[in-house]
């Protein structure tokens, strides 16, 4: 939730005259809202972030993910590639379904974006970040951190039918795995 501050604080931080601040408001350069009493409150944090004045050290992030522990070799290959090509970037690893939006690493990445700490996120493929909701994550990174997502390998363009078919198969695989996992757990409990 944005933090709004009084005019005095904005004037001190930006070192501008109050008339300049009003002109900025009129031009839509700074977000403002009025209290019930008619006082102006400004979203200084957003203004500083949007104009690169927030002084936060932004990081590059390499996000690596595989669906299961059986694919740990693929995860290690992703990490190796990222370490070689992006040595100064922080690496976040996840093991879990691309449909699961509560992965520890993904939540860490989103929190960093909301805190304005990300300059760029690098993933090998778009679906490594998320099978669904990629555009929302991209929007969060852009809006809160003024960052971007870089996809190293882009898949060939799919027709809408191919994309929907692939998505449905992925969803079915996740739920079949859940059902089989529950059955397996029940069998182990009986033994």
UniProtKB/Swiss-Prot annotation:
Pfam family, one: Resolvase
Organism name: Acanthamoeba polyphaga mimivirus
Entry coiled-coil feature ranges: 65-91
DNA-binding interval(s): 11-30
GO molecular function list: DNA binding; DNA strand exchange activity
Name used for this protein in its record: Putative resolvase L103
Alphabetized SMART domains for the sequence: Resolvase
Taxonomy, superkingdom: Viruses
Keyword Cell inner membrane attributed: no
UniProt KW keywords: Coiled coil, DNA integration, DNA recombination, DNA-binding
InterPro entries found in the cross-reference section: DNA-bd_dom_put_sf, MerR-type_HTH_dom, Recombinase/Transposase-rel, Recombinase_CS, Resolv_N, Resolvase-like_N_sf, Transpos_IS607
Upper taxonomic lineage: Viruses, Varidnaviria, Bamfordvirae, Nucleocytoviricota, Megaviricetes
Signal sequence region: none
Keyword DNA-binding listed: yes
Gene3D superfamilies on file: 1.10.1660.10, 1.10.287.2170, Resolvase, N-terminal catalytic domain (3.40.50.1390)
Entry annotation: catalytic residues: 67
Its biological purpose: Resolvase catalyzes the resolution (a site-specific recombination) of the cointegrated replicon to yield the final transposition products.
Entry's transmembrane regions: none
Resolvase/invertase-type recombinase catalytic domain ranges (all copies): 59-191
Family according to the record: Belongs to the site-specific recombinase resolvase family.
GO BP field: DNA integration; regulation of DNA-templated transcription
